């Protein structure tokens, strides 16, 4: 985490009009989590490609995060982006919603990033404890298995990549 913060913080904070964007889709059961994550990653790439072809280069970073609802035993994969420019963030959200008609518009968010946002983004990709403070090993196993080979963090546009940092989940 410290390597990620040190590697990206200055570059991200130098971006003009940095926006924090949350993009979600409906929660799923554990058996459906790998497919949901794969679909979300595919749609994210499609949206970025479409916007680039229209002349909008999204510059920033994407984070894939998964939370577990212990009461319902469902999983909620979602993205957090730090993107330069409110107009770009809005275009990202609009294109995401076009491709995710079952997503609740109220679950999506755009807000101006502040000094804490970069640090918060790099904290974790899954919450390791429930509200009770107990770790659910089965839920964590489901999340980790679904995340094998997936990038938790992905730079967008011409954001400079950090050297010597691997954030992929390995077998």
Predicted regions and their residues:
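Right-hand nucleic-acid polymerase module
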Residues: 1-75, 85-171
